[in-house]
């Protein structure tokens, strides 16, 4: 029987250049990427804070809400750290619906119906969500929370703006936090 040998690279022992040039990492991001090298040079610092979502996305990734590419999302903080952050944005109404289902769907039913009820709840829950979980930049995720706060009681506390709705009320600039337009958020 033929044998197959799989070589798993030890990225931890490689220098940044070796990781950057490896076929498995060539189009991914990390402290070793060409983009990171460029950002460190541009912002004149070696300090970076990259999260896993940033590192696991393509160098060409673009935020679906503000349309900025990663090179325009990264920004330097007042403390001299380059923030490279992407966030998983989801509809919190789905969380609220899930809580209601957990509290009510299984009361007073025999154990024999529990599995069937659980399947039914799993099938219904996505109908309560206005949009699927989406990766967005840190500034769009923050703009969602800030706009909900600005609107106060005019929106349900578990309401979330979709990425396209966020894109409609923000003013995006390269390497800066977003500004918001309350009029466009209503």
Region locations from a protein language model:
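Long, compositionally biased low-complexity segments enriched in polar/charged residues
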Residues: 4-33, 66-67, 75-79, 99-103, ...
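Short, charged surface segments at domain edges that flank catalytic/cofactor-binding sites
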Residues: 20-62
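A positional "C-terminalness" feature that preferentially activates on distal terminal regions of long
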Residues: 43-46, 57, 68, 142, ...
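Short metal-coordination and nucleic-acid-contact micro-motifs, chiefly zinc-binding Cys/His arrays
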Residues: 52-62, 82-84, 129-133
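Short cysteine-rich clusters marking metal-coordination/redox-active sites
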Residues: 60-67, 137-140
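Histidine-centered nuclease catalytic patch
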Residues: 70-131
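Polybasic, low-complexity binding patches
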Residues: 113-178
């Amino acid at each position: 029987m033929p044998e197959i040998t799989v070589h798993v690279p030890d990225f931890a022992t490689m220098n940044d250049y070796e990781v950057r040039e490896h076929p498995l990492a060539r189009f991914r991001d990390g402290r070793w990427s060409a983009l990171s090298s460029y950002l460190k040079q541009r912002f004149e610092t070696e300090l970076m804070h990259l999260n896993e979502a940033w590192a696991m996305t393509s160098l060409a990734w673009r935020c679906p809400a503000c349309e900025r590419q990663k090179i325009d999302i990264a920004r330097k903080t007042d403390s001299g750290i380059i923030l490279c952050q992407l966030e998983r944005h989801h509809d919190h109404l789905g969380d609220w619906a899930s809580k209601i289902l957990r509290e009510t769907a299984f009361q007073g039913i025999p154990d024999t119906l529990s599995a069937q009820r659980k399947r039914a709840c799993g099938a219904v829950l996505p109908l309560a969500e206005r949009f699927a979980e989406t990766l967005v930049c840190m500034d769009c995720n923050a703009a969602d929370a800030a706009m909900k706060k600005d609107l106060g009681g005019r929106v349900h506390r578990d309401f979330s703006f979709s990425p396209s709705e966020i894109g409609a009320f923000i003013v995006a600039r390269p390497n800066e936090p977003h500004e918001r337009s309350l009029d466009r958020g209503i």
